From Swiss-Prot:
Transmembrane segments: none annotated. It comes from Candida albicans (Yeast). It is found in: Cytoplasm. GO terms for cellular component: mitochondrion. This is Proline--tRNA ligase, cytoplasmic. It comes from the Eukaryota. The keyword Cytoplasm applies. The gene is PRS. One of its GO terms (biological process) is prolyl-tRNA aminoacylation. PROSITE patterns: AA_TRNA_LIGASE_II (PS50862). Its EC number is 6.1.1.15. CDD domains: ProRS_core_prok. Belongs to the class-II aminoacyl-tRNA synthetase family. Its main location: cytoplasm.
């Protein structure tokens, strides 16, 4: 009889695993970007540049797969555009002169920081043959580049970053808004899949442009952004979008004024606000849409022009008794040309002020890390790039229809940095199950102890044969594990698995077929213990025992090998 021995594939830790740990003394005070380097996830060859190891790529790929699944569900198609773009398109959209653009030698090309120009040009060349090609929705996952002058924070602000950028193309605004809401729904699912609490905040569109946008944030004290949430209507807005009213007015406050004009220069705008606050000119735009947001310092051109119209806009923190500066145009006497707008919030909000959205609740401020942004662009790019399609009308004629666009970004490398920052403790990182490089580290008792146990107990079975049975079980159950087959001690291996943030560790020791499982990962929402239901149903069958800490959190599980898959899956489902 011929016996065919089945080849057993055992997945082991990468070569980069633990390489830098022998001299690394972890402390929670060490910046997260340094921790990621010491743990072997990434390296920085130069400030702002990053190399990814196998372990870092495993996390990248899991996040990318979550994004792909949710974007595919809403019928976005994946593409991959060139990372180099010609200046011609960027001049048409007035973005060629932005400081953060990486221009190549010869000043003809750039490394793309985002792809609105190129994707619009791609659609123009490929899909304008028929209006029936719309709606159209595309996305890509690839590197982007920013000429960051002072890179800092590792992956949070570098010269290169991994990004998912998506773009939608609709025949009208109504359909474009439906697409926007569809993407917002997909983003909620993506961030829920990632397993870390997040907020969606109303936002200013900034350099990207457009009339509607939302930012997606992780709340954390290290974040460079600030978001405000109302305790009544629960509106969440970023700093540049949060309108607020004072709890009470300080009539003794000093008043400052900054001058603007309308775009046609026919009207002088005087913005009065408390000297101890920060004016946000875009808030004035809510009342005066045609304001030129570049302030002016020289008012001499208005000194002799008595036909100039003047609008005075008063911040809501001021009253008629406030200490206003003198009016700058001394010979202006035509008061019929002066319009005064009062009680208008035009300064950046502060914590504890009244919500400008519902005008009832109080605002609380939180530091946050931005990891995603959704924009409704309208014709911001389709107009200068002439993206129009022939559409039949009701009277059987043909008319040009300008395409309405949206764009939607997620910073994959930023997510990795942010989650690493948020999910740290005194032992190291704590990756959510959804993006951990692997879910379970397997550690075997040393070969010497295996042999000693066989000799002491007169066992005939080779422990390695028993352990290979476990790898078969894990492989068949599609559990994402890695065996730490390095020569270090078991204690050191377990400590390093904790440090690197792997959710679970399985210990194959001398008590086999009883297996020990150590719990490292956080529970979702900090209160999800669905494993308890499985424990109640299976504890006797699998000889399942549990150790807890002083707070009642499960830290170790002991189970018979026959219950390994059931227990591991029930624990991972909580993480």
């Amino acid at each position: 009889m011929i016996i065919i021995k089945r080849f057993l594939h055992i997945k082991t830790v990468p070569k980069s695993y633990g390489n830098q740990l022998s001299k690394f003394k972890y402390s929670k005070q060490i910046p997260t970007h340094e921790v990621l380097t010491k743990l072997g996830y990434i390296t920085y060859p130069r400030a702002g540049l990053v190399n990814w190891s196998k372990m870092g790529l495993l996390i990248q790929n899991k996040i990318s797969q979550i994004i792909r699944q949710r974007m595919d569900e809403i019928q976005f198609e994946e593409v991959s555009l060139s990372l180099i773009s010609h200046k011609e398109l960027w001049k048409l959209t007035n973005r060629w002169d932005q400081e953060e653009i990486f221009k190549l030698v010869g000043d003809e090309y750039l490394l793309v920081p985002t792809a609105e120009e190129e994707i619009t040009n791609y659609v123009k060349k490929q899909f304008l043959e028929s209006y029936k090609n719309f709606p159209l929705a595309l996305y890509q996952i690839n590197p982007k580049f920013r000429n960051e002058k002072r890179p800092r924070g590792g992956l949070l602000r570098g010269k290169e970053f991994l990004m998912k950028d998506a773009y939608s193309f609709d025949l009208n605004e109504s359909e474009a808004m439906k697409t926007y809401e569809k993407v917002v729904g997909a983003y909620h699912k993506i961030f829920q899949d990632l397993g870390i609490p997040y907020v969606k905040a109303e936002a200013d569109s900034g350099d990207i442009g457009g009339s509607l946008s939302h930012e997606w944030h992780y709340l954390n004290s290290s974040g460079e952004d600030t978001v405000f949430e109302c305790n009544e209507c629960h509106n969440v807005s970023n700093m540049e979008k949060a309108l607020s009213y004072p709890k009470e007015i300080d009539e003794t406050i000093e008043v400052s004024v900054i001058y603007f004009t309308t775009e046609d220069k026919s009207t002088l705008i005087c913005a009065y606000y408390p000297s101890n606050r920060v004016l946000e000119p875009k808030f004035i735009q809510n009342e005066i849409p045609d304001i030129d947001l570049d302030s002016i310092n020289d008012l001499s051109e208005f000194n002799h022009d008595i036909s100039t119209r003047i609008v005075r806009i008063m911040d809501s923190r001021l009253s008629s008794r406030s200490k206003f500066p003198d009016f700058p145009i001394s010979n202006f006497i035509n008061r019929s040309l002066i319009t005064t707008l009062t009680d208008i919030p035009i300064v950046l909000a502060q914590e504890g002020e009244i919500c400008g959205h519902c005008e009832e609740g109080k605002l609380s401020a939180s530091s946050a890390i931005e990891v995603g942004h959704t924009f409704y662009l309208g014709d911001k790019y389709s107009k200068p790039l002439d993206l129009e399609v022939d559409v039949p009308t009701s009277n059987n004629s043909i008319e040009k229809q300008r395409i309405m666009m949206g764009c939607y970004g997620i910073g994959i490398s930023r997510i990795i940095a942010a989650i690493a920052e948020i999910n740290r403790d005194e032992k190291g990182l704590k990756w959510p199950r959804s993006i951990a490089p692997w879910e379970v580290t397997v550690v075997e008792v040393s070969k010497q102890k295996q042999l000693k146990n066989v000799n002491d107990n007169n066992h005939h079975n080779n422990p390695q044969d028993n352990f290979q049975e476990i790898y078969n079980i894990l492989n068949q159950a599609n559990i994402d594990y890695r065996l730490d087959n390095r020569s270090d001690s078991m204690g050191k291996k377990l400590k390093q698995s904790d440090l690197l943030g792997i959710p679970l560790s399985i210990i194959l020791g001398n008590q086999y077929p009883i297996i020990e499982i150590e719990v490292r990962g956080n529970k979702k929402n900090n209160n999800n213990n669905s494993w308890l239901q499985s424990y109640t149903e299976n504890k006797d069958q699998f000889d399942w025992k549990v150790e807890t800490d002083a707070q009642g959190n499960d830290t170790k599980h002991y189970i018979h090998k026959d219950g390994l898959v059931t227990v591991v899956n029930s624990l991972l489902n909580d993480m």
